[in-house]
Amino acid sequence: MALKDTAKKMTDLLESIQQNLLKAEKGNKAAAQRVRTESIKLEKTAKVYRKESIKAEKMGLMKKSKAAAKKAKAAAKKPVRATKTVAKKACTKRTCATKAKVKPTKKAAPKTKVKTAKKTRSTKK
């Protein structure tokens, strides 16, 4: 199928789905079933359309319309804000040395387990 045929098929399916949805809202069970089946057909057709459109883009068959081309040019002409870059001051020996020094943290003393006396059984007979 050509890209145009696929697009036409998709629009026809969308229109019929829309009509059947209106009928299904009123309680028509057959229309509800048609909506379900046509939505599956639409899904498959959309998959084919995606493949064809990618193929057409690669071959250069898809052309931008004049209005879309003008919008793209207008968007390109907008001035871009320059981001300010803040220059870092050169490190002097004092500032770099103080930043580089890390104060050692005190380690907590290891906890020792408290020994408990073992209970012995009395062996009275």
From Swiss-Prot:
GO molecular function terms noted in the UniProt entry: DNA binding; structural constituent of chromatin
Entry superkingdom: Bacteria
Signal peptide start-end: none
InterPro entries in alphabetical order: Hc1 (IPR010886)
Entry keyword set: DNA-binding, Repeat
Region (Disordered): 98-125
Pfam families for the chain: Hc1
Composition-biased stretches (Basic residues): 100-125
Family: Belongs to the histone H1/H5 family. HCT subfamily.
Role of this protein: Might have a role analogous to that of eukaryotic histone proteins.
Protein name in the entry: Histone H1-like protein Hc1
Lineage: Bacteria, Pseudomonadati, Chlamydiota, Chlamydiia, Chlamydiales
